[in-house]
């Protein structure tokens, strides 16, 4: 896409929001409580602040303020306000390609924020536990928050990911014409690295005329030992392993498709 010569500041708002899910099976009530305590500590407010601060570093944002809070009995929230410094728009890379992991890239934001909220969850029956992290990166200006996508998914262990990207508002060029998007995008997947795409089954639901893009991701490989908390699969009977595998897989598909699935 040809670079636009704008009249004044770029007023487009670009928002990237996604849910990241981690699934676990805890055989007993003690294991369930242990998993919730473990995941709550692993992703406490301090750890999340480190992750979001590194996100700011990746996209070159200047941190204005950090608000963070751990909650009882569980959960945490962090919000970071960021700003930009003057930058030559000619230096901005707006092409469709994956962003970096922890490497630094120049990017500048204004009236923007990055926030995360966590939601550990379990049910007393069935042994299934889930951890959900809601993340939003919202920027105002020429930079797309999609550049932070790779890093954030790699930092948070993810069995299932749902991603939404939307461009809102408009900006004007020097001739007064409105522009409702200032970069090319066909799919959120184009901003992911090849190694990440190889790990997940993915599907897109995009509304191009509204500048709304949606991608869902489900981890391809299933290894039961990665989903057990303090219990080894070899300590279970074959029937137990099959039942737990079926329950976990059903849980993951229900979250992925966003609907309850009847037992076969």
UniProtKB/Swiss-Prot annotation:
Q: Name a GO molecular-function annotation.
A: adenosylmethionine decarboxylase activity
* Pathway, per record: Amine and polyamine biosynthesis; S-adenosylmethioninamine biosynthesis; S-adenosylmethioninamine from S-adenosyl-L-methionine: step 1/1
The Gene Ontology biological process annotation of the record reads:
spermidine biosynthetic process
Requisite cofactors: pyruvate
- Please write the reaction equations for the catalytic activity of this protein: S-adenosyl-L-methionine + H(+) = S-adenosyl 3-(methylsulfanyl)propylamine + CO2
**Catalytic positions?**
112, 117, 140
Looking at the UniProt record, the site noted as Cleavage (non-hydrolytic) sits at 111-112
* Pfam families for this protein: AdoMet_dc
Supply the SUPFAM superfamilies for this chain: S-adenosylmethionine decarboxylase
**Any idea of its EC number?**
4.1.1.50
What modifications follow translation? Is synthesized initially as an inactive proenzyme. Formation of the active enzyme involves a self-maturation process in which the active site pyruvoyl group is generated from an internal serine residue via an autocatalytic post-translational modification. Two non-identical subunits are generated from the proenzyme in this reaction, and the pyruvate is formed at the N-terminus of the alpha chain, which is derived from the carboxyl end of the proenzyme.
| Function per UniProt | Catalyzes the decarboxylation of S-adenosylmethionine to S-adenosylmethioninamine (dcAdoMet), the propylamine donor required for the synthesis of the polyamines spermine and spermidine from the diamine putrescine.
Family membership noted in the UniProt record? Belongs to the prokaryotic AdoMetDC family. Type 2 subfamily.
Q: How does it assemble?
A: Heterooctamer of four alpha and four beta chains arranged as a tetramer of alpha/beta heterodimers.
This chain belongs to the protein called S-adenosylmethionine decarboxylase proenzyme
